[in-house]
């Protein structure tokens, strides 16, 4: 709320200076212009930081959600546990993941033909 108020105040000042020219020609000057400095209160800092953290987390979840990665240490999709008879041993080779049981069955099927 406070940053919005400061931004609104700065916008009003710029509109007032442009409207107050009265058609005079603007020239560049080396004189110092009036600046408005707004100091944030000590209590306002953590709430702004919390809002920024929420925005960052939201962007990260959108990005990593597309890639199937975990955000914040929790999996997006909870995998179901496999029962003992459904477990298969897999290994990572140059051609990708392979199942030991599936390859063995294919070899047996080809050998019996």
From Swiss-Prot:
Tissue: Expressed at low levels in the uterus of both pregnant and non-pregnant women. Isoform 1 is found only in the adrenal gland and fetal liver. Isoform 2 is found in heart, liver, bone marrow, prostate, adrenal gland and testis. Isoform 3 and isoform 4 are expressed predominantly in adrenal gland and placenta.
Residues where Leucine amide is found: 95
InterPro entries xrefs: Tachy_Neuro_lke_CS
Localization (cell): Secreted
GO MF terms, alphabetically ordered: receptor ligand activity; substance K receptor binding; substance P receptor binding
Gene label: TAC4
Assigned protein family: Belongs to the tachykinin family.
Cleavable signal peptide: 1-20
Record protein name field: Tachykinin-4
UniProt record, GO biological process: detection of temperature stimulus involved in sensory perception of pain; inflammatory response; negative regulation of sensory perception of pain; negative regulation of systemic arterial blood pressure; positive regulation of cytosolic calcium ion concentration; positive regulation of flagellated sperm motility; regulation of blood pressure; regulation of sensory perception of pain
Propeptide residue interval(s): 71-79, 98-113
